[in-house]
């Protein structure tokens, strides 16, 4: 099972990725983890990436594709892999296609933006313990206070509505076009293209997992 998982920030990709990887016995690969591992291992590509990152520049798509090819050749990818947050742009998807990286499925978890904003901007956390709440779906017993210590809860910068909206704008401009890219590729050349599946990311975690498993067996 060689899989790309697509979806906006806050669509629940991370949660579903864990379940999918467990079911199929495959590793979850993100470009961030991959870069860190290559830098730590001191591979030639890792050394090159470190120089670029230390200079505050962005790692090129070519280098990332080479890292991807190196990563998926490792023994833990024998049964496949799940790409989370990669490819992020059309040029990356084109580069992956040109490099002959084979993908079986592209799975999109679709959640309306307004639902994501409500989901993320309603999160509250207790910094010391890591406990998290949601003003609507999992409220604390006393508004704004941690259930155990009674200490005040905070809203993380990442969860503020303005930040969430900005991240969704970036996603719309850069990554959302991949949905069209993979769905139209699947329609025009079904033999060569990965199977494209979209599921709703609304509802309970178990329901969404069930939808994901059904989509990946069809």
From Swiss-Prot:
Residues 30-59 are annotated as: NMP. Its EC number is 2.7.4.3. It comes from the Bacteria. Residues 122-159 are annotated as: LID. The keyword Membrane does not apply. It holds the Pfam family ADK_lid. It catalyses: AMP + ATP = 2 ADP. ATP binds at residues 10-15, 123, 132-133, 203. GO terms for cellular component: cytoplasm. It is found in: Cytoplasm. One of its GO terms (molecular function) is ATP binding. The keyword ATP-binding applies. GO terms for biological process: AMP salvage. It is an enzyme of class 2 (transferase). AMP binds at residues 31, 36, 57-59, 85-88, 92, 156, 167. Keywords: ATP-binding, Cytoplasm, Kinase, Nucleotide biosynthesis, Nucleotide-binding, Transferase. Pathway: Purine metabolism; AMP biosynthesis via salvage pathway; AMP from ADP: step 1/1. Belongs to the adenylate kinase family. Monomer. Consists of three domains, a large central CORE domain and two small peripheral domains, NMPbind and LID, which undergo movements during catalysis. The LID domain closes over the site of phosphoryl transfer upon ATP binding. Assembling and dissambling the active center during each catalytic cycle provides an effective means to prevent ATP hydrolysis. Catalyzes the reversible transfer of the terminal phosphate group between ATP and AMP. Plays an important role in cellular energy homeostasis and in adenine nucleotide metabolism. This is Adenylate kinase. The lineage of its organism: Bacteria, Pseudomonadati, Pseudomonadota, Betaproteobacteria, Burkholderiales.
């Amino acid at each position: 099972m060689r899989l790309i998982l697509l979806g906006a920030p806050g669509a629940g990709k991370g949660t579903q990725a864990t379940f999918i990887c467990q079911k199929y016995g495959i590793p979850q690969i993100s470009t961030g983890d991959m870069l860190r591992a290559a830098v730590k291992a001191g591979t030639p590509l890792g050394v090159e990436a470190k120089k670029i990152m230390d200079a505050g520049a962005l790692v090129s798509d070519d280098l990332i594709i080479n890292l991807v090819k190196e990563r998926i050749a490792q023994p833990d990818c024998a049964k496949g892999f799940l790409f989370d947050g990669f490819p992020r742009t059309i040029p990356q998807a084109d580069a992956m296609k040109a490099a002959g990286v084979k993908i079986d499925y592209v799975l999109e978890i679709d959640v309306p933006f307004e639902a994501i904003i409500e989901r993320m901007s309603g999160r509250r956390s207790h910094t010391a313990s890591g406990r998290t709440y949601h003003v609507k779906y999992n409220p604390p017993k006393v508004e704004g206070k941690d259930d155990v210590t009674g200490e005040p809860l905070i809203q993380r910068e990442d969860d503020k509505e303005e930040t969430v909206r900005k991240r969704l704008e970036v996603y719309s401009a850069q990554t959302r076009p991949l949905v069209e890219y993979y769905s139209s590729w699947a329609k025009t050349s079904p033999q060569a293209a990965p199977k494209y599946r979209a599921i709703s990311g609304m509802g309970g975690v178990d329901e969404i997992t069930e939808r994901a498993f059904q989509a990946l067996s069809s």
